[in-house]
A protein has these predicted regions:
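Pyridoxal 5′-phosphate
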Residues: 1-342
């Protein structure tokens, strides 16, 4: 028997997602840009999927851009906000020290282009406050980008409060919601979110497909040049089967969110309680404001990779950091950000 405990890295695709994808592969296989009937059936499925995602986020369908995943969505959001800022002479960007590398590496690129990036320090419980954001905003701030929930330690950030600060100050607010979508309630209107990224494979949808919410009126920079797909904002024939699967998975996750939260949170707390009894162990991240399915601990004197191999031999699949850095021997930037020693 295998115990899969690596759902922050990716999730098993649900039957709901598979059932939505198969007709798109077998029947509605046309190019959605084609005018013939097969193409238009694909276009209709694309439209319905866009409406489904928009419903789950409480936005308009025209505000959803489909992408290849969360990293592309993050890149497009940040580069677009930077372009707006450059035109206005505002070259200051605020983020946090424990963002996903899709954010941090894009910010490094923007620094080389002349932007000043300010990474807010993270409290030892893995939290950043709205007050920190408010105190950091300047006259030349063009963007605040703060993740909805951390992918390693599971901390849930006060997104609504941060969004309210940004809206009051007139600063664009982007959140990487890759770990939150399908697991936490998202309402881009109530939470004052201008741009939001998500990825299908984090909530039992397919890999290689994601979405970017962009509030109406915000101009986007094209990260991929080519055709006029996605209203000219993301070139390339749309991955209709993947998009259909992602939309179905998100709708299903949102419909069962509360019952899943109660069940998974109970399992999480039971596991944390048991593992915390191991000598020289410590839980990372906030215990109250935490993703339902996240458990992250440090064991003093234990090398992470060796522990993972032993767990795998025992039939337990887990990770010692984010999947995007699994080939690196560098210490987790997230754990360093909250003050954990190497």
């Amino acid at each position: 028997m295998t115990v899969y405990a690596d759902n922050a890295a990716t999730t098993r695709m649900s039957r709901t997602a598979l059932d939505a994808m198969l007709p798109a592969m077998e029947e509605n296989y046309g190019n959605p840009s084609s005018l013939h009937s097969v193409g238009q059936r694909a276009a209709e499925l694309l439209m319905k999927s866009r409406e489904t995602v928009a419903r789950c986020l409480n936005c308009q369908p025209r505000e959803i851009i489909f992408t290849s995943g969360g990293s592309e969505a993050d890149n497009q959001a940040l580069l677009s906000a930077a372009a707006i800022g450059r035109r206005k002479g505002k070259m200051h960007i605020i983020s946090t020290a424990f963002e996903h590398h899709a954010i941090l590496h894009t910010l490094k690129k923007l620094e080389k282009e002349g932007f000043q990036v300010e990474l807010l320090p993270v409290h030892e419980n893995g939290m950043v406050s709205a007050r920190q954001v408010a105190d950091a905003i300047r006259e030349d701030t063009c963007l605040v980008t703060v993740m909805f929930a951390n992918n390693e330690i599971g901390s849930i950030l006060p997104i609504e409060e941060i969004g309210a600060v940004c809206r009051e100050k007139g600063v664009l607010f982007h959140t990487d919601a890759v770990q939150a979508a399908g697991h936490l309630p998202i309402d881009v209107q109530a939470q004052h979110i201008d741009m939001l990224s998500l990825s299908g494979h984090k909530f039992h949808g397919p890999k290689g497909v994601g979405a970017l919410y962009v509030r109406g009126g915000i101009p986007l920079v094209n990260v991929i040049e080519g055709g006029a797909q996605e209203r000219g904002k993301r070139a390339g024939t749309e991955n209709v089967p993947g998009i259909a699967g992602m939309a179905a998975a998100l709708e299903d996750a949102c419909a069962h969110m509360e019952e899943n939260r109660v069940k998974v949170t109970a399992l999480r707390d039971r596991l944390i309680q048991g593992l915390s009894k191991i000598p020289h162990s410590a839980v990372n991240g906030d215990l109250e404001h935490r993703l339902p399915g996240n458990v992250n601990l440090c064991f003093e004197g234990i090398e992470g990779e060796s522990l993972l191999l032993l767990l795998d031999a025992a039939g337990i699949c887990a990770s010692s950091g984010s999947a995007c850095t699994s080939g690196s021997l560098d210490p987790s930037h997230v754990l360093l950000a909250i003050g954990r020693p190497h």
